[in-house]
């Protein structure tokens, strides 16, 4: 399954997040999601904000968590870009 899909408001990106990592980085695929390591701890929304910041910096769109805010597997909505450009950003 592709981790990127079209959404009525832009593109949806499925991610598997590893908080508290030594650095923030994209690490390839984890099942049907893109694996992202963030250095921020999973406390007070810090890891979620680090993830949103990374996705925005990588894609150039506006990102928000669509589902999974308290889970390691999340779906991120990226406004202002299409699924094809998001796929190219994460290659």
Region spans (language model):
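Contiguous, often N-terminal, cationic amphipathic patches that form binding interfaces
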Residues: 1-53, 57-70, 74-91
């Amino acid at each position: 399954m592709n981790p990127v899909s079209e959404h009525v408001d832009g593109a949806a990106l499925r991610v598997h997040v590893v908080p508290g990592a030594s650095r923030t980085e994209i690490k390839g695929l984890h099942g049907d999601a893109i694996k992202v390591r963030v250095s921020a701890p999973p406390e007070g929304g810090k890891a979620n904000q680090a993830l949103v910041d990374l996705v925005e910096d990588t894609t150039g769109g506006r990102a928000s968590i669509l589902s999974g805010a308290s889970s390691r597997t999340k779906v991120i909505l990226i406004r202002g870009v299409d699924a094809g450009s998001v796929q190219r950003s994460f290659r």
